[in-house]
Regions:
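Short hydrophobic/Thr-rich beta-strand motif most characteristic of the beta2 strand and flanking loop
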Residues: 27-34, 42
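Alpha4 helix (beta4-alpha4-beta5 surface) of REC/receiver domains from two-component response regulators
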Residues: 64, 85-103, 114
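Hydrophobic/aromatic residues positioned on beta-strands within the core alpha/beta folds
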Residues: 81-82
Length: 122
């Protein structure tokens, strides 16, 4: 049986490490990308069951990432996260562009893990 795969896309290494730790502890296989461009390239090579993506990153921000994903991969599941000032506006736009759920940094890990389980089940 293959493990469920999750792609983390965030330019902040500590956030990626935190998410990786929690997700791997829950039994998921995790891949990481440090920016949106790297993330979309990894997803094209090997689509994952879920993406957790920051919305404000260098090279290809999360909103542009969502646009590309929804154009190219209709069924990509994305949870959007953001910690920049005015993040609610960014997260509202992310929802409009196809993010299934959104979280402001700092987020509650138990809430995020519930969202991960929910999205993977639906």
């Amino acid at each position: 049986m293959t493990r469920t795969t999750i792609l983390i896309i965030d330019d902040e290494e500590p956030i990626r490490a935190l998410l990786r730790f929690a997700l791997e502890a829950a039994g998921y296989e995790v891949t990481e990308a440090a920016n949106g461009r790297q993330g979309i390239d990894l997803y094209r090579q090997r689509p994952t069951d879920l993406i957790i993506a920051d919305m404000l990153m260098p090279e290809l921000n999360g909103l542009d990432l969502l646009l590309e994903l929804t154009r190219e991969f209709l069924h990509a599941k994305v949870i959007a996260i953001s910690g920049a000032g005015g993040e609610q506006n960014v997260l509202d736009v992310a929802k409009l562009l196809g993010a299934r759920q959104t979280f402001e940094k700092p987020f509650s890990m138990p809430q995020l893990m519930r969202a991960v389980r929910y999205e993977l089940a639906h």
